[in-house]
Each structure stands twice: as C-alpha cells, then as structure tokens.
Amino acid sequence: VVQTAGNGYLCDQFQNSKVNLRTDQYGGSKENRARFTLELLDAVIAAIGATKVALRFSPWGTVLMPLDADPISTFSYVLGEVEKRGVAYVCLTQPRTDLFLSENVKWANLHDAVKDGSMVAKVEEINLLPFEAMLKTTPKLSTGGYDGKNCFEEVEKGELDAITFARWFIGNPDLVEKIRLGLRLTERNVETTYSNGPGGYTDYPVGEVV
C-alpha cells in the first residue's frame, strides 16, 4: 500500500503550514501538522505490517496549494518519524517537477519564494538531499523529470535506491526496453491523458516514433 503524502492530497494539506490553519492537536507546529500522516501510517502498519507500506512525499510541491513556509524543517521531521517505522520505501518528488507547470516555471517560482522570503531556504538547498539524509535505512526512491538519459546517475552514486517513471509510461508501452537500448522516448498527448476510452492512453505504438 502506498500512502500518498504529497501532491496536494489530504496528508499533504495537513503537513503544509500555509494550508493547515487548524488550532487543535493537528495544526500549528510541524509535529502537530505531521500527526495525521503519522497516525494514518500507524493504522495501515497495524493492519498489514510496515514492510508492505510505502509513502510518497513532494516536499517542494505546489500542486493546487502554496509552497510550505519551511519545507526542510517540515519534511525532515516527518521523514525522521517515518524512518523509525521501517516501511518498504519512501518516494520523493524532485523539486523541478509539477503537475501543471513546466520545469522552468517551477524553478523560477521556487527561486522567487526564496527571494521574497515566503519560504525559509537557500537556493542551493532546493534539492532532496536534506530529506534523503533522514532516511538512513529506508530505501529511497525519486520521481519527477527523469528520462532515459538522467535516470542512472543518482542510483549509480548510491544517493538513491531507484528512480521511478509515471508519465513516460503512458506514451511508451515499451519504456524499459527503450531505456535499455537508448531509444528516443515518445511524448504523451496531454490533451487525451485524462479522457475517456483507450485513445491517447493505451494505443501508443512501440519503438521510436518518427
């Protein structure tokens, strides 16, 4: 079971200091804002065991909500608590990626947040290293902005245990084989990604598309 604690979903809303305005035990401090995520995690672990549970976080995410005021502090705490629980793995979304924004726009927005003081961080700290450091024994995965060329380095260096793909699988039913052979990947048709029926979803050809 993958508990989605990122991308603007419910756990992420509780964790976010600019969205969670509660004044009870689930709001205010980072510990309180993490309470819902951790209580949910503990309930799932109690039901099926920690080794069958994984989590996904997007510390630098801005999907349908503002950037957290202090992502490093907020998510370092949450991940430190997750580390204690011995889950199967944690997948972290790269800061460069966003569901609705281009990579250039996302980076510009993050840099602007540093400059105007709406986020506590330095430009050089906008990466996953602080969060990876909290996961000393938990397998670390990452997603967002990877392709057939840049998907090896972090694993080969030992910084990550694996990287994951999502969008590329839509346009490339033979994604693994294409990466293995170094073939050009096919871009998905964004306009049909969320439409009904197989068109633009399960009808992409295999091999390189000219």
Residue ranges and their predicted role:
Residues V1-V210:
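Flavin-dependent oxidoreductase catalytic cores
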